[in-house]
Amino acid sequence: MLVVTITYVLSRTQFSASDSLFIAFAILLGQFVVGWSNDLIDFPRDRAAKRLGKPLVAATITQSTLKISIGIVLLSALIISLFSPLGVSGTAIHFLGLLSATAYNLKLKSTLLSVVPYIVSFGALPWAIYVAAGTKPPTWIVLGFVLFASAFHFLNVLKDLDSDVDQDVMGLPQVLGRQKSILIALLLAGLGILDVVLANIRV
């Protein structure tokens, strides 16, 4: 929900409240697609690691039902995104972000390039909003999205780091290890804060 909230706030700089809600809803549907497809792809590993917090592992939903749900929500995300203020150009960028996130789920999470989809997907979000409004996002906003998203990547893997290593899911944080990942995350977050502060001081 954090991504959706940020989307709404950022959209309000360019669009009305109702239009911003429309855009945020399109992004929310995209987030569902990414999260559910990740659960589907990771199911064998999640089951082996006994992650009962996952619906598929807990058997609260079947794989076939989840596949159908992903298809329906993906189509809904496309239609709503196209008919929202994002239009064709913003939707194209939105779906570039979804494609990047899917590439992470499918393959890149297990490579040294694991942070790249975070850079692409979250860096694309402000572009989708601003391009749809007929302008381009300030550099500091894009940079902030990239820095904070990258920091999140290094922190987000920590809870499953040991089981990831056991299952040979060797993304960049897993290769670097827990301590280095925490340090890098703190550095990136610090740079993100500095970016926001300096940009607003100049304003």
Language-model segments: residues:
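Multi-pass alpha-helical membrane architecture of UbiA-family
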Residues: 1-203
